[in-house]
Amino acid sequence: MTAALPARATIRDVGPRDGLQPEEPVAVADRIRLVDALTGAGLRRVEVAAFVSPKAVPAMAGGAEVVTGIARAADVTYAALVPNRRGAEMALEAGVDELTVTVSASEAYNQRNVRMSTDESVAVVGEVAALAADAGVPVDAVVSCAFGSPYEGEIAPAEVAALADRLAEAGATALTYADTTGMATPRRVAEVVDALSTVDVGLHLHDTRGTALVNAYAALELGVTRFDTAVGGLGGSPFAHGAGGNLATEELVALLDDLGVHTGIDVEALADAALLVEELVGREVPSGVAHAGPRHRRAPSD
């Protein structure tokens, strides 16, 4: 190890939203089961829904029912993705604790994803942030394609940092860099994070090329302590060709446990939640820890 690691890390599981979004629709009652399983395992930040058009994203229909149906815990932050002011109004009315918004560092990706320019999306963030501020709710701005675009290749770290500054000026209270395309490497993580004036940034990592876990370790060495992950490693953007799922929550927690970085999350219960995801989507999830368990698990004696 080349640097002291943080004593603690915070994980936001985005599985109920980002993980299930590209799947065939899962019943609201089952999505509620998943959220409750995650908080039961110790997660204290969960992205539970997206308030988007159900015609455009059928898997996210019924977001308000999910938010109102979960077993709310006072010490858990329940977040929802919103694409615009109307989505923010619906999410706040449902009672979410945090709003997440996305703007891409790639102009081409932003056009394909939300049919707006980056400038237009920054303006939307300002509208959402103003509404959220009136309600006393924080807004996390997620910069997608922060480590590269499938249409434009690598994006200069200074450009990514400039967009982050604009989002903060627009009213975002937190910032997350997303490796939407799975193009990040430890080198790119260092370059992009170092370009910021502060390391108070979260990372949302995808495992398209099998580098998500090593990228998380590299980020820890840089002082990053906030991570977005998805139980079971599900997810992936339809606008990023060949994009893999998110870094599996249970795999990151298993690593952090071994490194002595506290999360407050029970990795065994989390592995069980990943198997619940398999039941809900009807296929095997791409997570080694979900199937083999953490490294300390012992085989049955018989």
Language-model features, listed with the residues they occupy:
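Catalytic cores and adjacent flexible loops of soluble metabolic enzymes
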Residues: 1-302
